[in-house]
Amino acid sequence: MVLMLGTGCFLVLVLLSIMSLYQWGHAILAISSKKSASNQRSARTTRFLILIPAHNEEDGLPETLKSLSTIQYPKDLVHIAVIADRCADDTAKVARAGGAQCLERSEGPGGKGAAMSWAMQVLRNEGTLFDALVIVDADCLADLHLLEAFDDALAKGHEVQQGYNYLSNPWETPFTRVIAVTSVLRNFLFYGGKEAMGCSAMLSGTGMCLSRSVVDQHGWSAFSVAEDWEFSVSLLLNDVIIHFNPLARVYARESKGLKQASRQRLRW
């Protein structure tokens, strides 16, 4: 019995050591790899459709739309659409006041994944013209160079991209400070390490970019609570690599504490 316990502990230690080495390998590669700067191409021709899934987001949506309106990219090449999914507030009114197209959904299965799948089908039926789809949550602020960074990576053949997700309020509470640290570690060390190794990243729900060909071929086929990871696995099974783009940045407002964060993550 003692021998079996000893063997079990040894195997656990070996497994933990392997996992630790794997993570340290990611970190070393991420730190040592050179970050390529944006190409700063003068001629922009890529048409972007920015899709904002929203469920009772009247409070945060105005700031999101305001940040998107200031992005440095030709305005005639950007179309913004908000999915007002089963909202009991003024999300739809706020979306239209902010200059966005509003797609109102009042029935059907719940969940962010179902809302996005429905919206993509509606926009396709309407004949909305776009070369790439960007998904941004309704409580996020967009970096000025978000679309330029996505466009430069698209030009290099990266058809699916995950941008750098950080917080807009990293120093507000001890909880947000912890989340900010984990965000940096996840972005720079984990995703950055995978990128340096030539491996695929994982989608994170916001700050995502899909080429039109990927949208046409795969649509949105993930409907679980973790729809971003589910869709990531679906893409990987179809040999589609997810490129981590650290220059394409969005900033989400994090909840002040764990209880609020739990409600926020399950708000759909």
Label each residue range with its predicted role:
Residues P62, D89-A97, H145:
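Acidic helix N-cap motif at the loop->helix transition within catalytic regions
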Residues G127-L141:
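Short beta-strand-to-loop acidic/aromatic patch adjacent to the donor-nucleotide binding site
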Residues E104, G111-E126, L144-S224, S262, ...:
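Long helical/loop segments within the catalytic core of UDP-sugar-dependent glycosyltransferases
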Residues A84-A92, E107-P109, L141:
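A conserved acidic beta->alpha catalytic loop
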Residues M1-R44:
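N-terminal membrane-anchoring/stem segments of glycan-assembly enzymes
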